[in-house]
From Swiss-Prot:
This is Peptidylprolyl isomerase domain and WD repeat-containing protein 1. GO terms for cellular component: spliceosomal complex. It catalyses: [protein]-peptidylproline (omega=180) = [protein]-peptidylproline (omega=0). The keyword DNA damage does not apply. WD repeats lie at residues 88-126, 131-170, 221-260, 278-319. It comes from Pongo abelii (Sumatran orangutan). The gene is PPWD1. Its EC number is 5.2.1.8. Its main location: nucleus. CDD domains: cyclophilin_WD40. Transmembrane segments: none annotated.
Amino acid sequence: MAAESGSDFQQRRRRRRDPEEPEKTELSERELAVAVAVSQENDEENEERWVGPLPVEATLAKKRKVLEFERVYLDNLPSASMYERSYMHRDVITHVVCTKTDFIITASHDGHVKFWKKIEEGIEFVKHFRSHLGVIECIAVSSEGALFCSVGDDKAMKVFDVVNFDMINMLKLGYFPGQCEWIYCPGDAISSVAASEKSTGKIFIYDGRGDNQPLHIFDKLHTSPLTQIRLNPVYKAVVSSDKSGMIEYWTGPPHEYKFPKNVNWEYKTDTDLYEFAKCKAYPTSICFSPDGKKIATIGSDRKVRISKFLTGKLMRVFDESLSMFTELQQMRQQLPDMEFGRRMAVERELEKVDAVRLINIVFDETGHFVLYGTMLGIKVINVETNRCVRILGKQENIRVMQLALFQGIAKKHRAATTIEMKASENPVLQNIQADPTVVCTPFKKNRFYMFTKREPEDTKSADSDRDVFNEKPSKEEVMAATQAEGPKRVSDSAIIHTSMGDIHTKLFPVECPKTVENFCVHSRNGYYNGHTFHRIIKGFMIQTGDPTGTGMGGESIWGGEFEDEFHSTLRHDRPYTLSMANAGSNTNGSQFFITVVPTPWLDNKHTVFGRVTKGMEVVQRISNVKVNPKTDKPYEDVSIINITVK
């Protein structure tokens, strides 16, 4: 038997003298506090005495993570559920950025760039540039907000002085550019800017104020076309990514384009930077927290990843895939089923036209929250507590793509606000407050929208001025208006002759002229003759107007789709309402439906253009026919014989 040390012998004797502890099911708060204190003071002794967890530790509940001052941080973020204002471009808006010098810059698909100045409440227009002859591929603003650049498929880069809103340089690149980014920091001798070639992995570094000759070329850093280039101004490092999922760290001219020395890793195997390649995805958006320590990305697999910049280790992953939203809708309904289906169709179209690459992510000024657009609206995520704390624009009929966040006070005052001024009851000083604003671009719209802390005054009124018409109508719109002044093409009543009886309707040509014109011209031309009611849902509606009878066909009298015409006095507030069927916003063709119950959830989604005045019993009989439960198509065809327009 081995000899025992003195301390082992004393401990063994103590164990023998200790009485057997009674079983405890619960501990009082005082006992719990004392036990925790004793366990902390005598860690070494406890480790020798016990094998496994202490009884007190086993009863400790895991505390929920809380972000201190979260309410204060949220007070400085937009909170309105609906957008306050929207402004126009001539074409679909694709990009938006916000500068530290209180400017908002928007770019549209036709190569135009607009400068807007943030004021105390809202924004004001500053200047309009025809920047490129073709499509704008990417825009970027410098870290201090002094310089802005854009690249387009006209093989050119335009450089602007933001504060003086003037174009100061133009570079002829000689290749089709893909991405661009200012990679200099305040104090650097050269205002360097990076641009990538769209079809290869090459990165060219230029002097933004210089000539067309590149200062440096990265030709082996990436082997696939680049998807993002972003500067971390705190650590003076650049992060770039390509379509193969590879992510690289590098520096600009002051550090001779080498690997940054201030990061805490040397080999990628020590990081999670291969995560995208493992998932066969790539980043479509990259941004950094204000302190430079966090990096947020959105991937082509629709996952949001939050990582530590210095170590490259993953912190959080948020799944925003379509399958996740479908499961969420099934578990707990987020939207009405029809609206959810419409938004899912928009998401699939996003993927079809590769517009997912335009969705971006931004940090707030604290670095505790990220904001990005989803099919439910703009999500505000607390990355510390792993919770979605707010959704902006859930009620709106827009799919948010790019967004820019402004926080702070736009109007600069001559004197700084002192403690005495803050404590005073001066009403003028009390009016000086922050106006946090999210400026976002939607999918396939020529407007950009602003979410603030203020809800719009009246969204249902036709005279609501939250949508500002700051652009002149196009030539096509003028011609369409001129043609409408010719022979009368519309009427205020029609009779739909069906195989089950006649339906008399009243139309609204004043409130929705284009929709009524489309219906009347189609009816006069015999377009609807022989069309079946291809979709009938008992207790909801009957739908027709598709020449194919599948629900996928039909077009307008202009040979395509036309825009919605919502009016405050025309609602789905009663049965026997005529309304246009669509596949999303501004996709009206020839299909229409007649409701058999009030359907208020369809307001501002489908254009109401008529009411049934006689023949309600015919509509009811049609809605009660037997249908295929899977397709809602009647077993025996009910068809339109013809439509008489009075």
